[in-house]
């Protein structure tokens, strides 16, 4: 698989490469490091929007991008969730729901691609992704990084909403596969 030299592919690669940096600064455990980690996560999350937008608008869609963009998204979200679970006592249930859905949907998407069925990303799924990224940004920063006492609680509430939407939006993939079971 050849990586075409184009901006969307570089943004996808950058999103993957920033993950260890986010984790590293998170474990430094001071307010400046937390702020930097949250900022890096926000920037990485924003690249998720721009890589797809630029690829479609300027006809720069590649096989690499189609394959690795969702992988980069899952790696970013999954690594941050695991990091938060280990270090900050974030509620496990919404985290596990999000992780389980992402793995299942990734498998279903691969299966659907084999049988030549495409399930478009819904607006609700885009809202789900935004809320996941927003909640995780808040939780990375947390009360320790911001000095805002209840910021962790706000992040957890948004994470629960994102988990609920995660389950709802995952259903469309199961529905598309139903006739193959």
From Swiss-Prot:
One GO MF term attached to the UniProt entry: CDP-diacylglycerol-glycerol-3-phosphate 3-phosphatidyltransferase activity
Key word Repeat present: no
Record-annotated membrane-spanning stretches: 8-28, 35-55, 64-84, 148-168
Catalytic reaction equation(s): a CDP-1,2-diacyl-sn-glycerol + sn-glycerol 3-phosphate = a 1,2-diacyl-sn-glycero-3-phospho-(1'-sn-glycero-3'-phosphate) + CMP + H(+)
Pfam family, one: CDP-OH_P_transf
Superkingdom field: Bacteria
Any one Gene Ontology BP term: phosphatidylglycerol biosynthetic process
Recorded topology in the membrane: Multi-pass membrane protein
Cellular compartment(s): Cell membrane
Enzyme class: transferase
EC number: 2.7.8.5
Entry-linked InterPro entries: CDP-alcohol_PTase-I, CDP-OH_P_trans, CDP-OH_PTrfase_TM_dom, CDP_ALCOHOL_P_TRANSF_CS, Phosphatidylglycerol_P_synth
Gene3D superfamilies, sorted: 1.20.120.1760
Name this protein carries in UniProt: CDP-diacylglycerol--glycerol-3-phosphate 3-phosphatidyltransferase
Source organism (scientific name): Rickettsia conorii (strain ATCC VR-613 / Malish 7)
Gene that this sequence comes from: pgsA
